[in-house]
């Protein structure tokens, strides 16, 4: 039922959290900041533009999240997580076949606090070249 499915999803997020924290070198940390949802972006390793393409996917996911009122954050170390034997086994378990590289984890949830005010714009940060 639904409860079992939710537990399964929570277990997967927890597994990804532990794997990411291990790469970070702080096994007890929560690099996902308590977010209930983690989207993993992968790209075919033989795609020479995989990091650029995957980065565009991450950016679009984060923009879409903002558009529907969700908070998001790009969490690194997906490459290291999915290059590990445990990560490769996880991909096989999910039915992902082929040689993929992890690009990023996009965490989603609702903010626990209000968003900080934007930083002031930097003067002379963008230059127009004619």
Model-inferred region functions:
Residues 1-3, 7-8:
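Short, small-residue-biased leader/transition segments that mark boundaries at the very start
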Residues 16-53, 59:
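Helix-adjacent hinge/juxtasegments
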Residues 45-90:
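Small-aliphatic-rich amphipathic alpha-helix that forms the alpha element of a beta-alpha
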Residues 96-130:
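C-terminal helix-cap and adjacent tail motif
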Residues 22-23, 89-93:
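Short, hinge-like loop/turn segments at secondary-structure boundaries
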Residues 28-30, 92-96:
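A generic local secondary-structure boundary/capping motif
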Residues 10-14, 45-47, 112:
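Short, charged/polar surface micro-motifs in flexible loops or helix N-caps
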């Amino acid at each position: 039922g639904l409860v079992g499915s939710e537990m399964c999803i929570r277990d997967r997020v927890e597994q990804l959290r532990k794997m990411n924290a291990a790469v970070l070198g702080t096994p007890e940390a929560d690099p996902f900041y308590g977010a209930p949802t983690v989207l993993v972006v992968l790209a075919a390793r033989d795609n020479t533009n995989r990091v650029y393409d995957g980065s565009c996917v991450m950016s679009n996911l984060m923009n879409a999240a903002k558009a529907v009122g969700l908070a998001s954050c790009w969490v690194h170390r997906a490459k290291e997580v999915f290059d590990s034997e445990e990560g490769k086994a996880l991909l096989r378990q999910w039915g992902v076949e082929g040689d993929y590289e992890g690009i990023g984890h996009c965490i989603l949830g609702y903010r626990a606090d209000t968003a900080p005010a934007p930083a002031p714009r930097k003067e002379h940060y963008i230059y127009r070249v004619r």
